[in-house]
Structure formats: structure tokens, C-alpha cells
Amino acid sequence: ICAAIAAARHGSSVALIHSRPVLGGNSSSEIRVWTRGATGGGNLFAEEMGILGELKLANQYRNPEGNPILWDAILLDAVLMEPNITLYLNTFVSQVEASEGHIKTIQALEIISERKLTFSSTLFVDATGDGFVAASCGMEYIIGKEDSSTHQEANASIEFDPTTQGCTILMNTVKKDHIVPFIAPVFAYSLEHIERLLNNGGRIVCEKSNGCDFWWVEFGGQQDTINSIASIAFELKKLIFGIYNYIKNSGKFDAGNLDLSWVGSLPGKRESRRFKTEYMLTGNDVIAGKTFDDVAFYGGWYLDFHPSEGIYSKTDFCTQIPVSLYGIPLRCLYSSQFDNILLCGRILGATHVAFASTRIMDTCALSGQAAGTAAWFLVSQGKKTKALAEASVYRKIQSILEEDDMLLPGHFPTDSGEEITFIPSSVITSLPGKELGLLALDQDFFLALPVSLAKVSSLILDSEQKTDLQLEVSYSMLPSRNSYSKDKESFRKSLGQGRTTLSLMPFCKGEGYLLLVVKQHTGISVAICDQALSGVVCGYTASATYYNPLLDIDSFAGFGAQNLNNGYTRPYGGANIWLSSQEEVPSIKIVLPKKRKVSSLTFFFDCNLSEEMVSSRVQDVDPHHNIYLRYGVSPTLVRDFEIFAHIDGKEVLLRQVKDNFQRHVDVLVGPVATDLLFVRFLSTFGAKNTGVFEIRVH
């Protein structure tokens, strides 16, 4: 979806061919796996944006309950709104005609109509999950786990292992107001069989288990997840119905009123082919956060390993190693030996170890936008895939991706070259809210904020007695609560009794973001605030529930209008946001160096990039997911605003935007000739201060 939309928006004519009746792959209502990514891995301010961000924000606004059927509709809406996309659902690609590294045509069957279709194109993007198109044209691939000597990966198998991660079928249940009997189908596994599988390695059920709680009902990793998928699906059906029968009829659960509302028919597949591309991302790259000149998107989910035996394993159902945000190069999406095909999704060029992180859906979606943008650029310039290795080509693609709200770790934006002056009506001068309460340090606590802000800030604490605090400090461009730098420095600080402040200035020896970890200490609490200060967050290192620290701040100069054209559209090395005071109608005056034609303005608003926006949800989420499910639109997002221009001595209204729910907003206003624009921000979704990362004038 993201590849098709990216290419279409930039001007390509796109045929989107999908074998299923609904869009969304593993996140669709057919399979119902929720979308997760870098934020779910503990990275802060790291929620994936771009086209995926648009889809997620639309889902938060229109589908706050996380109904997977409505998620399907949001995806379909997004595709159908693009005039350059022709959508082919229920269409299975059956044959690829290719020679000498060039695809000529692909043949497909529209299953419900029996139409045989032939597609010819200048360029193809394979987002099939199994890589059918790429494999059919002869691109080399790997199935299984490389040995540790191949890429010197510490987490790799000692010897080559042909097994993979398995597949899963989920189920949904509902609670009724009456007893609902259940007689298991004959094919379901017996209560005895299921009991032998449960309660090992975290495989625990209860009457509240629902939806993605059953992700560990996994099978097929020791089989061929492509050619044996039908038998794998049947085994999973036997398991999932057997597990439901166990919950209902074993007598161990209060499940009399429980009713089965849905069971998947199509397995959610984790792994099959991985292709050998121009560069193979390794686990070492992921752990080190290696920088790439041709970085095109990013990941940040754990190195998340599942035993290939799946539910039949006696070991833990997964092993998750936290990683910080890492970039992924464009070279992972193509092989120069094939001149007109790009890859995206879980088939991209990565070792099995790196794949344990890159396979997650949010990362796959970002790879789609990168591939779609690159595809359009190559076609528009009459170039082949090998041109993507040229600096002049990938730098242009990078600038386009950044314009389209894609974060490229390690790539720093260039100056636009135009001297535009932004004059705000106000700048924040005090914390947005008031004290909410205290957060006890009964486990390790973290505070993340820009070093520039930390230099003028103190953390407010309460201590029952005089004591010493154990602290750890690290620095990064974008922090993670559970994967902080190996170069961390340890401190010991004395604390007085009662309400006290801890100056952060002594810890500011690095640049970018400061991550301060206060080790568990009974009798000490941190004061928290009821309103967010953009670019600042705190919480427990082991929890995805975050808080707003109550800070004593000497200066808010870092939240001025200088951020509106510094090139950064989210927290990265700093807060990078203008925050108004709590005035009724904050505004920005935009002064151009000379009168010129203005056609549009682009805004990047604050939607709270530290809280996950998943595609679907259930009412009760098992704590082992370690996820905070936000409801609806972030209070910090700008909702209503107006744009004016100074024309012939008068202030003229160009556009009113009402009920905006997007972060990246392009507003057409012209063309109009002017050298002075005004933007008035009429309301947010609840925040008292208006926040804007970037404004661009086109």
C-alpha cells in the first residue's frame, strides 16, 4: 500500500495487485495482527510516520476502538483516493516473464471473475511477502538461518539452520450476558493435547485472552512456509479451536459466558524467503546503529527471535533483545543484477538476525514508501535500479522522503536556501500544566530530554530521608528507554529529605538527547505533571506507560520559532518544536524575503510520537505485550487553523482548515503573490499550548 501510494502521488501510473479480497496483509481483518514498530521496541519519539503515519492517524480519529474491519476500510479509502492507482483485489500473480535480469510481463488471474490479466511495466515492486515475483525472475534468496561465521553475528546459529519463524492463526472472543455452550469440532485437538502444550515458556491462557494474545500459537517454522502453508493452516486451526475448547470446557476458567466471535482462516506468516540484495543488513548493523550514506528508512523493534518449533517448543516463546533506532539503506531494496525490480517488506535484504527486527509491520511499511518513491524516481528519470547507487540519485530520493515525513537516521537535512522569517505571537514561558502526583522509584526510572533543555532544568523529587541516588547517563540523537548507550556514565548524587530538586546541568557532557536513568530506590518519588511538554518524557525503563516530568526550567528559549525552519520535523537531537504560550489564538507571521507566488504551505504538527498507534486492539490486553494503547487523537495535535496573506495592503483569508487529524498537512493556498503570510491556530485536540515542528512555503 505504502509503495503504491508513494509512487502514485509523485506521478506514476500504478497497478496495485493483491491476492486477497482486503488490503492490509497481516494487519487486515483476515489475520488481525496489530501493527507495531520502533516505539513498541522502547524507542522514544520514534513512531513511524510518512504514509503509514497518515493511515494510523486516520485510524485513531475514525476508528478509536481499533476495529480491524474499519482498519480495512481506512486502507481501502487511502488507495481509492489516489487517481493514479488501479486496484486489483483477488488477483493472484501466477507467472513472470523475464530474461537477463529484466522483467517483461507478469501474468495474473483475477480469481472471482476468472479473467486472465497480463501486466507490462517499466518497473515492478515486489511486496508479496514470499517474494514470488523476485524469485520467479531468478533473484537469489535465502530460507533459514545463516551460520555465525557468515557475517560474524553473535546471535546467529553456529551452523546453517534451514528452519524459520512459524505462522499463527488468531481468534477473538466476546463476553455475553448468558451462558454460551461450546462443543468443539471433531478436528480440534483434545484437552489433554492442549494441556501438554500450555504453561511452558510463557504460553499461558485465561478467559480474558483475546486477539494478539495468541500470537504464540505458532507452527510451521520447521516446514516449508510457502509450499506447505495449507497443511500449516490446518494444524493451526486444530490448535486454536483446541485452545478455545480448553478455555471453555477444561473447568479451569470462568468462561461460561464466553463466545467465539472470529477465528482466522489465513495464517499470519512471519518468514519465508529473504533476498540477496546490493547490501545485506546484518544483526551487527542493527545493534550498532550503523549509519548509511543511502539510508532510506529505519527500524527499532527488538531483535525478536521465535523458536522454529513454535507452540511445540519447551523454550521461551520468544527472546527479545532491545535495540536503538537504526537506519536501513536503499541498497537493501534492490539488486543491480535486475534492472527493473525493487523489493519491500519482510523479503528485503537482511540476514536472519537482522530480519528478527526488520520483519515487523511498521518497518515493512516504511520500506514500501522508500521503494515506491525510488520506483517513481527511476521511471521519471529513465534510469535502472543500479542508478540507486549513485549519490546524486539517492540524495534526491532522500530529500523527497524527508519532505514526505520519513525520518532518516544519521541523515541531516540541508538548508532550503530561502531566508524566511517566522515571528510567533508568543513562546512558552512555563510548564503547560500543574503537578499531578508522585511516581515512586520502586523500579528503574528514566527521563529523556534534549541536552540543551537539561542544562537549564532540574528534576523535582520527594525523599523520605537523606540518601544517595545511583544514576546512569547516556546521549543519543533519539533515546530509547531500554537500550541506552553502552558508553553510559554512572553517577552518585546526595539527596536531602523532603521536596528537593536535582539539577541536570552536571550530567550535560554530551550532545543531542540526554537519557537519565535513576536506579530503583525505595522512599523516593518523582513529581509528575498533568500536561505534556513536547520533546520530554519520563517513566519506568521496563514499561511502555509514559509520564510528563515536573521540571523546574529556567529558560524555554529552545522552544522558539527558530525551530520552524531548522529542517527537523520531529524530536531528533533536540525538541525541534515551536510551542506557544497558553494564549487564546496563537499565531505565526511568515515573512518572505521578497514578494513571490505562493502555492501551498506544509505543516508538521505534534501527534505525540512516543505512544504507539496500532491498527487494531481488543478490550483487555495481556500485560506481557508491554504496550500502552492510546485512545483517539493526541491532545497535542492542531485541529483548526486559518491561513491569511497580506495582499494589496489587506489581510486576505486564503484557507480555513477544520477538524484536521493529520500531522503532515499540505494546504493549497494559491498561487497568490505575497511577501507576508499569517497562520492562526484556533484549536488543538486538548493541549493548552500549540506546537508546530516545521512550516514550509512552496
Listing of model-derived features with the role each one plays in the protein:
Residues I1:
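Beta1/beta-strand and adjacent pyrophosphate-binding region of the FAD-binding site
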Residues A6, S12-S13, I17-H102, I142, ...:
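Conserved N-terminal/central alpha/beta ligand/cofactor-binding core
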Residues G11, S121-T122, T674:
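Short, well-ordered alpha-helix to beta-strand connector turns
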Residues N26, H102-T105, I112-L453, K466-G498, ...:
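Flavin (FAD/FMN)-binding glycine-rich loop and adjacent Rossmann-like elements that form
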Residues D444-S483, G523-L533, T569-L653, D659-H698:
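Aromatic, loop-rich ligand-recognition surfaces of beta-strand-rich domains
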Residues E511-L515, L676-F678:
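Short, conserved beta-strand segments of beta-strand-rich sandwich/propeller modules, principally
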Residues C529-Y547:
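Short beta-strand elements
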Residues A542-S581:
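Compositionally biased low-complexity segments at domain edges in trafficked proteins
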